[in-house]
């Protein structure tokens, strides 16, 4: 069923949990995925905005950073084509509470998965939940050691 979606192949390649999803879950994930474009310099996510969703970068570059009270920023990590931006939907993870900013450093094309649907899948499917928390832990680990 999900194979008829234009995004199914891309999602299947990007997410190691794809084969652990039921056909209905695959179809739901595809149905609530949409292409997005961010121009160079655009704000993708901030603590003041609603939850963007999970971003699968097709091309371009995003920078994730924190802002200090005096306005200085600290880059946490950068994401490139083929990578998944999980913290653009940190609202789906109860254990993650961070005032994160994400900007497009280059024109960026991505697929955006609805935060609400991803949250539902995390609640229903342990493979999705493990993937989300593992990817978050890897991002923070990379930040600590670079």
Where are these regions (language model features)?
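Cyclic nucleotide-binding regulatory module and flanking cytosolic helices
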Residues: 1-39, 89-92
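Alpha-helical structural elements of signaling/regulatory helical domains
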Residues: 21, 71, 124-128
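Cyclic nucleotide-binding regulatory domains
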Residues: 43-105
